[in-house]
Amino acid sequence: MARVIHTGDTHLGYQQYHAPQRRQDFLDAFDAVITDAIDEGVDAVVHAGDLYHDRQPGLRDILDTIALLRPLQDADIPFLAVVGNHEGTRDAQWLDLFETLGLAERLDDSPRVVADTAFYGLDYVPQSKRDDHDYTVADHDADHAALVSHGLFTPFPYANWDLDAVLADATVEFDAVLLGDNHTPDTAQLGDTWVTYCGSTERASASERDPRGYNIVSFSSDATTDVAISRKSLNTREFVFVDADLGPTDGTAFIQERLRERALDDAVVVVTITGDGDTVTPAEIERFGDDRGALLTRVNDRREFDTGDDAPDVDVSFADPDDAVEQRVRDLGLDEPARDVDRIVRDDTLADAAVRERVIQRAEAVLDDDADAADDDGRPTTVEEFQ
């Protein structure tokens, strides 16, 4: 029998809300997964993509990852992973670096057998390339088979990738498909195949209200079930969600009273305003929450404001602008060069004066089909540059 931890969407390096503490929180959550794997003696840790939040993680993020994966190596627990959409590069992947160090294995179309189960990997594939993608995989002689992949698959919400078609085109029958990308954990069954999302290990957006965690997946030849999927929650940073539905005369004082009713110490506080009421200044609410011990406070005003007879309805949100932009960019279905430009413009580590030059470099590299120049930003992007 094979028993593995199925995790993903760890988003290491994400300095959410521009808070260094949140960057550490994402690392701590991944650390907790690794610790559980060793304590429980699982057969493998299977990561379904988006180990990193960005395709250019900082050196500190790389070193922290190495430090966390070494105990797994010492415990003889393999770390099996695929590449997600956030971290994918044009050339060698970060997983390739860890593989050369003996710390990870990048799953592909060849079986990686753990106990009695063969694991295969399917990296994130952009929508424009899926119709031409070859889903042929090598055969195996294990008792069970599982596919690990990253993307928004049917039959789950927000899907744009037909899993039925993938399974039909695959040359191996899978007992389970272990997925990443959707941060909401969920499980379904397509015919005889179990399909499951593990969810994220930390809250990457204010919409992720449920506890974070990972899956434990067991493969056996039991007469009742071949695949068993269970959940394990992680002890992550406390998020306090305050939903304030304002009446006609309510305003800042009403929201402050709601905050007084809650324990805010060291928490990320997310205030969502709906209803009617007076004008509320987000900065005033944020200062109030922070003064009461919150790590940080964000206000999300969902009310509609009419600024004139012919003015359109406006939905104003202050909760997580970076997350909102990322989601909008993703919804637009932009190709990789366009997503590169978006990341450059929003990179708060890049001086404003350098943005124009960096965008021009990217554009010229794409036009010349020069992938090396496209990644020429001074950071190592291949295994060879690390050696």
From Swiss-Prot:
Nuclease activity is regulated by Rad50. Disruption phenotype: Mutants show a slight growth defect, but do not show increased sensitivity to ionizing radiation or alkylating agents. Show decreased rates of survival after UV-C irradiation. Display extensive delay in the repair of DNA double-strand breaks. Its cofactor is Mn(2+). InterPro entries: Calcineurin-like_PHP_ApaH, DNA_Repair-Maintenance_Comp, Metallo-depent_PP-like, Mre11_archaea-type, Mre11_Halo, Mre11_N. Signal peptide: none annotated. Its EC number is 3.1.-.-. Residues 365-387 are annotated as: Disordered. One of its GO terms (molecular function) is manganese ion binding. Mn(2+) 2 binds at residues 50, 85, 150, 181. Binds 2 manganese ions per subunit. It is an enzyme of class 3 (hydrolase). It comes from the Archaea. Mn(2+) 1 binds at residues 9, 11, 50, 183. Keywords: DNA damage, DNA repair, Endonuclease, Exonuclease, Hydrolase, Manganese, Metal-binding, Nuclease. GO terms for biological process: DNA repair; double-strand break repair. Coiled coil: none annotated. Homodimer. Forms a heterotetramer composed of two Mre11 subunits and two Rad50 subunits. Part of the Rad50/Mre11 complex, which is involved in the early steps of DNA double-strand break (DSB) repair. Mre11 binds to DSB ends and has both double-stranded 3'-5' exonuclease activity and single-stranded endonuclease activity. PANTHER family: COMPONENT OF ATP-DEPENDENT DSDNA EXONUCLEASE (PTHR30337), NUCLEASE SBCCD SUBUNIT D (PTHR30337:SF0). NCBIfam families: Mre11_Halo. Belongs to the MRE11/RAD32 family. This is DNA double-strand break repair protein Mre11. It comes from Halobacterium salinarum (strain ATCC 700922 / JCM 11081 / NRC-1) (Halobacterium halobium).
